[in-house]
């Protein structure tokens, strides 16, 4: 119930001033397969680029979660890293949870479940992530205690 009152976007699978680098990052949506094999002829290609995102008004979003692999990576430009996260930032998203590398699907699913439960319980974003990471480390006889399972998730601009 509490989560319904928040303005969040969650991305479970994904794929600046420099427009070219914003065109090289994006989210693959329905229809992207056809575009990638050149079998589509409509204007909706199923690829939402960081440039398209940057041109949206997302200033109402408190948190964007990009929990797929490498969502915090991008091209290094004079004003920072330019990638999908830069598109959301330019669009006005107030904060993001991103990843800094390859992530394990099962561990990510468990971590995100803990994270969302913590948010719904009233924790702020930092507390929710920290608690979720600690819970994942202890989960099921500590099978996810290695930092490769939990340390690649970071919050950006999540000042509270």
Cite the ranges covered by each PLM segment:
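Catalytic cores of enzymes
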Residues: 1-160
């Amino acid at each position: 119930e509490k989560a319904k009152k928040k303005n969040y976007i969650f991305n479970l699978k994904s794929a600046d001033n420099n427009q070219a680098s914003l065109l090289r990052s994006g989210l693959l949506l329905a229809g992207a397969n056809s575009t990638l094999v050149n079998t589509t002829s409509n204007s909706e290609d199923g690829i939402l680029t960081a440039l398209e995102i940057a041109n949206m008004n997302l200033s109402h979003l408190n948190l964007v979660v990009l929990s797929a692999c490498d969502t915090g990576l991008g091209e290094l430009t004079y004003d920072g890293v330019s990638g999908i996260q830069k598109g959301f930032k330019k669009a006005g998203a107030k904060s993001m949870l991103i990843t800094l590398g390859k992530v394990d699907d099962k561990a990510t699913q468990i971590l995100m479940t803990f994270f969302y439960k913590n948010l719904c319980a009233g924790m702020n974003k930092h507390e929710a992530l920290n608690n979720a990471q600690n819970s994942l480390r202890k989960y099921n006889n500590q099978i996810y205690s290695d930092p490769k399972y939990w340390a690649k998730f970071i919050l950006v601009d999540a000042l509270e």
